């Protein structure tokens, strides 16, 4: 751990002296670990009571100090920390979206009552560069069905070239799915921003099917709370698609609907016609 420099420590019942810290690399939308050593520099003991009492937590602020995430994940104390005693704590840190420059501010909180900073104690304020979730923009495609000449032509025409090896994200399509030229770029943008699953809009050719797929109609923006599974999703390593409306789909959190990434779907494209 790296030693923390000198900082103001108030006189009173509740005061923290930050001694050392170690923070793992932060990637957008991903949890990592931090380890901190701190001393009870006040006159009152610190006690955790399950999810209540004194907890170690954090805020994410922008470079100007505006809160981005105020209530970070809590870490309870392993024991009562008496005045003058030190303790080491491991903290799970969930990085914000999108990547960029942030301030990661650790503080103690008396749960449901106050943060120690509010009663005069100094928090630990660290500059952190949150990196993109994916280290490289490498998108591959899995075709669920027989080869299709039109689908292949649409994939070759992508603005951002697809890869056949060492993909960091895999998009799941069906024969007759025709992604727009900017589709691959928009999916990779979503992964880079911090989402494990990114799915686009579906433009249905068959009129009889349009009501069935109305929730995925093109023309919308970006929505991390669509309320429906993503269709024809792009998924990071470790995720597998399910099925919804007879298409590859993803249901779960950590997902973004990218309404500008449009896939035109011919009739009978891997599903029964309505």
Predicted regions and their residues:
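Low-complexity, acidic Ser/Thr/Pro/Gly-rich terminal tails and inter-domain linkers that flank the onset
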Residues: 2-28, 125
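Short, flexible, basic/aromatic active-site loop/helix in glycosyltransferases
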Residues: 201, 217-248
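Short beta-strand and strand-turn-strand segments in soluble, beta-rich domains
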Residues: 14-18, 57-77
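Donor nucleotide-sugar recognition loop
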Residues: 245-252, 262-274
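Short, surface-exposed loop/turn segments at beta-strand-coil junctions that are enriched for proline
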Residues: 92-100
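N-proximal low-complexity "stem/linker" segments adjacent to membrane-targeting elements
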Residues: 131-158
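Conserved donor NDP-sugar-binding/catalytic core segment of glycosyltransferases
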Residues: 178-217
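Short beta-strand-to-loop acidic/aromatic patch adjacent to the donor-nucleotide binding site
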Residues: 165-180
């Amino acid at each position: 751990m790296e030693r923390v420099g000198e900082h103001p420590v108030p006189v009173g019942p509740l005061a923290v002296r930050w001694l050392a810290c170690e923070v793992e690399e932060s990637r957008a939308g991903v949890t990592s670990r931090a380890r901190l050593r701190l001393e009870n520099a006040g006159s009152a003991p610190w006690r955790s009571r399950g999810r209540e009492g004194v907890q170690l937590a954090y805020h994410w602020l922008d470079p100007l100090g505006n809160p981005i995430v105020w209530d970070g994940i809590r870490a309870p104390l392993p024991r009562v920390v008496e005045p003058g005693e030190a303790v080491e704590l491991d903290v799970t840190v969930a990085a914000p979206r999108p990547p960029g420059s942030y301030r990661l501010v650790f503080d103690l909180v008396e749960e449901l009552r106050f943060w120690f900073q509010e009663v005069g104690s100094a928090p630990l304020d660290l500059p952190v560069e949150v990196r993109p979730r994916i280290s490289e923009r490498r998108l591959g495609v899995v075709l669920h069905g027989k080869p299709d000449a039109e689908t292949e032509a649409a994939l070759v025409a992508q603005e951002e070239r697809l890869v056949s090896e060492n993909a960091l994200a895999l998009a799941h399509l069906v024969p007759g799915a025709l992604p727009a030229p900017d589709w691959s770029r928009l999916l990779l943008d979503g992964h880079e921003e911090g989402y494990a699953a990114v799915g686009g809009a579906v433009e249905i050719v068959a009129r009889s099917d349009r009501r069935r797929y109305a929730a995925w109609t093109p023309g919308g923006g970006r929505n991390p709370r669509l309320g429906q599974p993503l269709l024809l999703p792009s998924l990071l390593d470790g995720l597998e698609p399910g099925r919804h409306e007879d298409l590859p789909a993803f249901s779960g959190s950590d997902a973004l609907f990218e309404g500008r990434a449009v896939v035109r779907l011919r009739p009978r494209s891997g599903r029964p016609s309505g």
